[in-house]
Amino acid sequence: IFFLFSCEKSDDNKIELFVSGAQIAGVNGMHFGPDGLLYAASVIGSDISIIDTETNEIVKRYDLSDGVIGPDDVAFNSKGEFYWTSILTGEVAGFNVKGEKVIAGNPGPGVNPITFSDDDRLFVAQCFFDNGLFEMDPSGQTAPRVIKDEIGEFCGLNGMDWGPDGRLYGPRWFNNEIVSVNVDTAEIRKEVGGLNVPAAVNFNSKGELFILDTGDGKVVKVVDGIKSDYALVELGLDNLAIDANDDVFVSSYSEGSILKVSPDGIEEVLPGGISHAGGIAVAGNDLI
């Protein structure tokens, strides 16, 4: 936010930085690429930022000029190609190994989480605008396959990951639970209940399940069906990602921050701040 101290022409006029915002306009889905860098999607910012979590720097950014439109989540296949979902338009697209944009299809607005299986099958689900689960053709040559056209009220699945049992795991936002899906038979099984507002799941290399419960502002760890609080963070969280060292990172849609979290504490990767301000007003001595 900048303050302009006068509207009259004068050599004394100046623009002063009053408060700086977040480096990303609200962080949504995240995924570590084969290069070890963290790829973070932003719907409001309409970009995908690539972050070095060792130096805490944004090293590259894909935006509208690259054909990235309102991305909500991002995922990689075994070739190193990455795809994203555009929640507002319904487009599912990616960049192939040549760096060319490829449109996989459009199952409709609300496409939110995205993931590749180990054999490079592409899956997306809808949340908030609709509630379906689909398999997509990454090349866009065949229409999306409907696995389930209604998984949960107002939201199918959010941030998804593959379990060690080969099933697709994901949170049902409004149902306070985690389910798994057999993507070939569409059979759904409840895995974890008693959550507040689960937003995302991820497995580490040991096969341990981590859940981001955005309603309670915390990360929950599940081992042998037993839940425990892994890290108490803050409200306004959106998604989580786990790196090759099993370190856990969470994103904030409200603050635009990325945090590394553990039972020992919280480390800032990207600090939060004003991430999508809509206006400004002054009331007495208060800036609103």
Task: Name every feature range the model reports, one short phrase each.
Residues 33-60:
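N-terminal, post-signal-peptide region of Sec/Tat-exported proteins
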Residues 14-21, 57-64, 99-105, 142-151, ...:
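A short beta-strand motif characteristic of beta-propeller blades
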Residues 38, 58, 82, 92, ...:
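Hydrophobic residues embedded in beta-strands of well-ordered beta-sheets
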Residues 4-17:
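Bacterial Sec-dependent N-terminal signal peptides
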Residues 47-50, 91-94, 131-135, 177-180, ...:
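A short loop-to-beta-strand structural motif that recurs across blades of beta-propeller domains
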Residues 22-35, 65-80, 91, 106-125, ...:
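Beta-rich, blade/repeat-based domains predominating
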Residues 52-56, 95-99, 136-141, 181-186, ...:
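Short loop/turn segments that connect beta-strands within beta-propeller blades
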Residues 87:
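Glycine/small-residue-rich loop that forms an oxyanion/phosphate-binding "nest" at active or ligand-binding sites
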